[in-house]
Swiss-Prot record:
Assembly behavior: The RNAP catalytic core consists of 2 alpha, 1 beta, 1 beta' and 1 omega subunit. When a sigma factor is associated with the core the holoenzyme is formed, which can initiate transcription.
Family: Belongs to the RNA polymerase beta chain family.
Protein name: DNA-directed RNA polymerase subunit beta
Top-level lineage group: Bacteria
Organism: Methylorubrum populi (strain ATCC BAA-705 / NCIMB 13946 / BJ001)
Gene3D superfamilies assigned to the protein according to its UniProt record, in alphabetical order: 2.40.50.100, 2.40.50.150, 3.90.1100.10, DNA-directed RNA polymerase, beta subunit, external 1 domain, DNA-directed RNA polymerase, subunit 2, domain 6, RNA polymerase alpha subunit dimerisation domain, RNA polymerase Rpb2, domain 2
Record InterPro entries: DNA-dir_RNA_pol_bsu_ext_1_sf, DNA-dir_RNA_pol_bsu_external_1, DNA-dir_RNA_pol_su2, DNA-dir_RNAP_su2_dom, DNA-dir_RNAP_su2_hyb_sf, RNA_pol_bsu_bac, RNA_pol_bsu_CS, RNA_pol_bsu_protrusion
Keywords: DNA-directed RNA polymerase, Nucleotidyltransferase, Transcription, Transferase
Amino acid sequence: MANTLVGRKRIRKFFGKIREVAEMPNLIEVQKASYDQFLMVDEPEGGRADEGLQSVFKSVFPISDFASTALLEFVRYTFEQPKYDVDECRQRGITFAAPLKVTLRLIVFDVDPDTGAKSVKDIKEQDVYMGDMPLMTDNGTFIVNGTERVIVSQMHRSPGVFFDHDKGKTHSSGKLLFAARIIPYRGSWLDVEFDAKDIVHVRIDRKRKLPVTSLLFALGLDGEEILSTFYNRVSYERDGADWRVPFDAERLKGFKASVDLIDADSGEVVLEAGKKLNARNARLIGEKGTKFLKATDEDLVGQYIAEDLVNAKTGEIWAEAGDEISEKLLKALDDVGVTEIPVLDIDHVNVGPYIRNTLAVDKNSAREGALFDIYRVMRPGEPPTLDTAEAMFHSLFFDAERYDLSAVGRVKMNMRLDLDAADTVRTLRREDMLAVVKALVDLRDGKGEIDDIDHLGNRRVRSVGELMENQYRLGLLRMERAIKERMSSVDIDTVMPQDLINAKPAAAAVREFFGSSQLSQFMDQTNPLSEVTHKRRLSALGPGGLTRERAGFEVRDVHPTHYGRICPIETPEGPNIGLINSLATFARVNKYGFIETPFRRVKDGVVTDEVAYLSAMEEAKYYVAQANAGMDAARKLTDDLVVCRRAGEVIVVAPDRVDLMDVSPKQLVSVAAALIPFLENDDANRALMGSNMQRQAVPLVRADAPFVGTGMEAVVARDSGAAIAARRSGIVDQVDATRIVIRATEETDPTKPGVDIYRLQKFQRSNQSTCITQKPLVRVGEPVKKGEIIADGPSTEFGELALGRNVLVAFMPWNGYNFEDSILLSERIVKDDVFTSIHIEEFEVMARDTKLGPEEITRDIPNVSEEALKNLDEAGIVYIGAEVHAGDILVGKITPKGESPMTPEEKLLRAIFGEKASDVRDTSLRVPPGVTGTIVEVRVFNRHGVDKDERAQAIEREEIERLAKDRDDEQTILDRNTYARLAEVLIGQSPIAGPKGFRKDTTLTREGISEYPRSQWWQFAVVDDRLMTEIEAMQKQYDESKKRLEQRFLDKVEKLQRGDELPPGVMKMVKVFVAVKRKIQPGDKMAGRHGNKGVVSRIVPIEDMPFLEDGTHADIVLNPLGVPSRMNVGQILETHLGWAAAGLGRKVSKAVDAYLKNQDIAPLRAEMEAIYSPSELEGLSDEALAEAGNNVRRGVPMATPVFNGAKEADIETMLEMAGLDRSAQSTLYDGRTGEPFDRKVTMGYIYMLKLHHLVDDKIHARSIGPYSLVTQQPLGGKAQFGGQRFGEMEVWALEAYGAAYTLQEMLTVKSDDVAGRTKVYEAIVRGDDTFEAGIPESFNVLVKEMRSLGLNVELTNSKQQAANDQIEPPADAAE
């Protein structure tokens, strides 16, 4: 790692022992490769392959009209340049997409009315616009309406055939009922299943069931063929009073004789009754030459006839195939002289009579009846005819338009049923159906195994490209219907393809998919890790997948085939557990959609470097050793017995039987889990929480890479796109906070500019309102290699992921402030902004055109003091950099009010004084409660044709200046490069012509040539033709580059000056971005990487915190009781190693100081060589070493990869090297008393994250606010500015205290006593503190509810009621 730019800046000590052979695939390759394969933007030489978008068009086109007189064919498609680039789309709130143009060919035929022959009459070709196709950004996301979205890959059941049983749940006897199911990619499902009576049924699309023989009849078999397909036959021949039956040892193997077996020829007993026919007996009988055995009539009774027995002369059928032989039938056959009876080989043990029994109960016996039955099931209520029934049956399984197994389905089917159909055969064949029924019957007979649904060989991944392909196909099919109708209704001779096509349905399908599909998700952009994880997510939910409610335990559980493919740790807690997973680090998806993982090949016990990617199905047949199996220097396996996996089982085998070996110990886990050091020492539940919480870490103002990492940090930072990598090698030309200009040095394509300009993002808002800001890492003049990190992004430091901060932790209780996982922090953490983060809130306001007149954005707002307008410019928009608080005006806006008719006098006054204030109201955008911050950006959007205000013009001018600066810098570098190359060619030449004043045949020198302006150098002409050609080519390239540069600049300016596309009725829109600084405070949630989460309970002055002997105070105090029960010991090991890292940092720091003082590098080199391995320091100069040393002053960063990291002994070695106690415990002193604590305390550096659950976003205060309409109680929730609910249990608490008056006002005037609360308000205003509680509104609601039930409830005054009761006469008298 030392040779990269980042490595030169900070070197990580690596503890991994196992060399990694395979390169880890790019982390977002899943998304990018899939979508590229779908779009295939650049058409290859020989045309596009039949996949992705091409296959969609091919499957829908050609389209013919109903009379077949015209045909619309698809030729090719192309993409044009997107109208706006990614950043422009983000800012304007539009979709990043490219226009799709499709070339279509319309062929019109002449049809001869007599013969029906067709001849081509006309061919027209035309490019048709088919809507915009969203493009993927370089980071694997889509920009839809200005927001970044991710399409999550879906796990679903692979197409193919599956065999299963009901686990004995259906029938009360617990009998296993077997079933087979053929699942196509699209089309009807076919189920074949047994019932409790062992009859085989078939269902199509889960409709009513039919006997399976009806399906076989419909396929064109007759009864005899069905039986001969499923059963062997045995022939019985008459031999006097008995029968002869051929002796077949193979068929009778394992058969137990109930009577003596007698040789039909010799009459000898070959097997006595009660004995079993085993291999030895069979051989002996064979040696005796037995060919036939004797059989009696009793043996024949109960057997089934194999073929129709027919009188050859009269055609009379004596017995049909499948009939059971009874004594009566046998006698009848004897009477007519039948001497040979073929029977089915059914012994009721190895071969059951299931198909024969099904045939017997099936009321159909021919194809027609079977087809009618299938038709009635599929379309109940419609009368079938043979033609419609045949057409419907054909379209169910044999029509490529309606039924598609897909290549995957065909491959899976071939593997499961031992067939060999090409994977282009996408429909079912007769042989497939027969093979499925055969395999099912074999299962019932006890042969073969059922399939495991959760095996990764039976589940596949549908990525973006495939999901999009399916969606687009739906859109095109909707379009097809419209095209057919249009073709039939217009004059086909005069129309062009354009007139037939309405691309709206296709565009709508795409828009609907990206906008509202369950798998199109708002990207989690909290930090770079959460982005990467989101793109690598696999969901079993979504259209065509499972639902939370239906998914059982098995689907969610970890399966042995997940090893190296799906992470067993990272999955959400809660209802989605196990349904949403993450791809493992080395996993990739193959062309069939199965997840593959890499292995090293092992030959004769020697491990090679050859890497093979295998899917779960392929892996099953190999013995796979772990990555940590013992090897010697020659890579030979050293153990006598090696622990291996094979087909989900763990077994021990000899080294020479091992076929494969894992590539890396971390191939088991996902990216997030691979970032947890000492993962192997944590309990799985806590590791799960750790993985999930790293994704919620907020980027902090100052990123700090962990002292104890795993080596994955740099990979995540690079692949996530948070840190910027150089696109080409070159030399840094300019650097400032907003951009880096690199002059490319590698020879590049002449059409590309020789300059790369990298714009850095500054204070951009992410989807989660965290702050995206990038800062440069390079200096002017530094050489940069392609792929090196040149700028850090959010949560990255020196090109490494840095989600949190290293803080000094003490594990000890502290006055109960860390009870129940609470966290105690030092004031230093707040003062030094250790856990301060910046959040950017976006507010927008629109000026609409209303019925009463247009709204106006202005500074002139009625009844507002000048003080309130102090932050607004003359256009009424807040300044950048202004500090705003809750209630401040951000954008002034007035809306016209409905006017009352005016008297003539008023009209006159209005005309004279132009008073306008009375007819408008203030609808300005104000800062919502709870927000305080600084304005970082303002964007103004104007509708086309609306005049721009001063602010919009100022923003536009600024932007144009920025673009002009880019153009000028690029031009300068282009000039410098080109003229330098031209000078190289000309110097030393003696031109025959040149600029004015040049003497012919003078030899040019560097001084001589510089006398002329550079633009005149092109006028030199030399004799050498080759050089002249070179100079001309150079000039042509220079002019073209210049022209391209200018054109690009003009295009961008034109886009800026063009009006914006705003929603209908909106004249102007202003977006204001406020940066809010959030310091850590009590109530914020923090966590480590091991699932050790807690809430900050108190921030203590630094002098009260526990401190070490040298006066160093702890930054954070955690409760030691949080560790043992949760079994996440990794955090303790991390603390120890972090302590050692800081100790080593101190030693290196001293050596660096010595070097800076007296320029002696030796002590520093000795120190560094003691810490790092020689390969890590290879090729470092003294300056580079000093810089590396300087960067590790605070602590030497370590990498301890998962399952392959530092062991206890390594930690102790490091502690000793740092001159610390091997126990890593220290004597601590109480900050308040100065006394030492009773025993030593574990102290060290731990990496803590601040999570996105901030108390500022959760808690708010309300005095008055909105009330619910019906109950008149305050609303709830922060968003509604609601109150805190005083619920049932809180009422009990006040009752328990006997606080009657407090309780009364809680339930009345502070809640829903409408009159009462108004009176209280008035009383408070008057300064009076007496009030009376009335009736709560919710009581009235209850009364109304009871009345609606027909129960009249009336309220009466109890005193008056008592008085009335005394006077009232008896009830009957009153009648």
